């Protein structure tokens, strides 16, 4: 709740919603907690009606300022939980559009791609040289928000850099960069990209398994019926230009309720 108030010149918005299929038995206490603490919008819909999918997609589109217009082909399950994030910030030190040129960019594949390369010279930025990479911090607005750009050293892969990321290391790197400023000649591609991913494997790598297993999941605070998470998808949009950055994300979680299984092993 404090993040949107950090900078009046930068937009940061978070929204939550819960969509309940028809009369699926979601506990009132669960709904009340989400309304009170997460400011969630909660609606009952008939997922079998095509208009329900449209209603949910429009909500996501509105909350992401049109950046993520479509997150569902067909509403499924018994309960859909959605979180959205939207960010729009202007650089403290904007790039001059007149300095933007078509140049080659070399992604992980090594195959060159022509891009619009932005250029900013003779400007001071927080900077740090780690063992495997260099990092520079580009601030927005009143300096409450910033983008940290990481450039692997020659011969070092992105994956090798990511493997060193931990909370402790990240704090140490940021602290080191805050204490050192460096005048940089900075080149950064103008970016507009969309990304969609099933993020259940990420949770599983973190040790979370039961929530996705119909035989083990415990959602008794949500419903008295057996329930499990069938799907978590995340949609993201990132736009980086000479003036600043727009970023949006929508994460959708499908929860399926199952009927109690009654085994009749004696005459009935």
Region roles according to the model:
Residues 2-160, 175-262:
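Non-catalytic, conformational "gating/processing" segments within enzyme and secreted inhibitor domains
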């Amino acid at each position: 709740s404090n993040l949107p108030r950090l900078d009046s010149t930068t937009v940061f918005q978070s929204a939550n919603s819960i969509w309940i299929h028809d009369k699926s038995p979601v506990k009132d206490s669960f709904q009340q907690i989400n309304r009170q603490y997460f400011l969630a919008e909660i609606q009952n819909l008939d997922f079998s009606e095509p208009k329900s999918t449209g209603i949910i997609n429009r909500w996501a589109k509105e909350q992401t300022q049109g950046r993520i217009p479509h997150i569902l082909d067909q509403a499924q399950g018994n309960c859909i939980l959605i979180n959205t994030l939207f960010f729009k910030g202007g650089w403290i030190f904007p790039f001059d559009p007149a300095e933007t040129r078509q140049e080659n960019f070399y992604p992980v594949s090594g195959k060159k791609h022509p891009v619009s390369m932005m250029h900013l010279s003779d400007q001071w930025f927080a900077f740090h040289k780690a063992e495997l990479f260099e990092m520079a911090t580009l601030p927005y607005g009143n300096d409450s928000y910033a983008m940290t750009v990481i450039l692997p050293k020659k011969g070092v892969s992105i994956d090798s850099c990511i493997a060193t990321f931990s909370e402790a290391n990240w704090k140490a790197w940021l602290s080191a960069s805050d204490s050192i400023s460096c005048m940089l000649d900075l080149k950064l591609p103008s970016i507009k990209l969309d990304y969609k991913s099933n993020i259940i494997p990420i949770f599983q790598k973190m040790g979370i398994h039961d929530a996705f297993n119909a035989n083990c999941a415990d959602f008794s605070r949500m419903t008295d019926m057996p329930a499990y998470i069938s799907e978590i998808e995340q949609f993201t949009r990132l736009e980086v230009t000479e003036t600043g950055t727009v970023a949006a994300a929508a994460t959708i979680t499908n929860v399926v309720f199952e009927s109690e299984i009654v085994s009749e092993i004696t005459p009935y």
